[in-house]
Amino acid sequence: MNTESESFDKVKTECFRFIKSQETSKEKFKGKEKMLKSFLIPSCFWISSKAKSKHPFFLGIVGGQGTGKTTKSSILEIILKKYFKLNVFKISIDDFYKTRKERLKLSKKIHPLLMTRGVPGTHDINIMLDFFKKSKSRKFKPFKLPKFNKAIDDRFKKNQWYTLKKRPDVIIFEGWCVGAKAEKNSTLKKSINSMEKSKDTKLIWRKYVNNELKSKYKKLYDQLDCLIYLKAQSFSLLQKWRLIQEKKLWLKNKSKKTKNKIMTKEDVLSFMQTYQRVTQNMFKFAPKYASIIFNLNSDHQIKSAIYKK
């Protein structure tokens, strides 16, 4: 019989190696053994039991900026592959951002704020829907998926895109707004930050984003079989984590070609205001519909887990 302690012994080396690759000299990952034993491995047992009846099994992972979605989803991928022997494909909703050229066109047609990547409406929803459809096809054929380079705020060239060669058992689809739902139109009237107050005076931007969630994104998210929500304590904490994240990106991209695309502290805080409305709406409602909720402390650590279905 498979046990969680047995699985820990089999995956710990690879998981710890990955965690180490994400650390910096000043920032070390805390409580990694507890995270694996108490939370991520048990969740993989839960996921694998559900995935047996449906191929592919669409696993959504959502959390605000800097909650560790990429790190935690990568560890889940390692465990599901190494211990459960499942074919897993992981991709971020960030990889589906529209190109700079497409967002520029959108910003001129609808609202200038849509030049800034992030909110629903700035992703290529048709490619995402096509990705889900092709992944489910019984006559599966290999296909390519976009890869986004945040350092240049645009897609990588096609020869650097992902290739899905075989139909996966599990697809991990992670991102800050994965599974997000639209809010009531009445709540859109009140601005929640200085950006909305000064740059979206006619509510055009927030209504557009909300309508995207209500229609196209709902069609996509309704296809998720499970949603894991990484719940932070506050939006101000997310801002702090996002600044750390940007510093890491800067360290990785010191070349002259990309340096001017890395954001300053002021840029990050301004940038995050575009995320605030959807993120705060998820604080209120995602715990009601997520399948698994990981409550995080101020150090990114999972302090508790709730399994709902």
How would you name each of these model-derived features?
Residues 78-89:
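Post-Walker A helix-loop "phosphate-sensing" segment adjacent to the P-loop in P-loop NTPases
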Residues 2-16, 21, 27, 37, ...:
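Conserved NTP phosphate-binding and transfer environment spanning the P-loop NTPase/kinase superfamily
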Residues 131-181:
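Phosphate-binding/switch loop-helix module in NTP-utilizing enzymes
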Residues 70-73:
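Walker A/P-loop
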Residues 28-32, 89-92, 96-153:
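Conserved nucleotide-sensing/catalytic segment adjacent to the nucleotide-binding pocket
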Residues 58-63:
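Short hydrophobic/aromatic beta-strand immediately N-terminal to the Walker A/P-loop
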Residues 56-57, 86:
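Nucleotide donor/acceptor-binding cores
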Residues 25-51:
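N-terminal pre-Walker A segment at the start of P-loop NTPase domains
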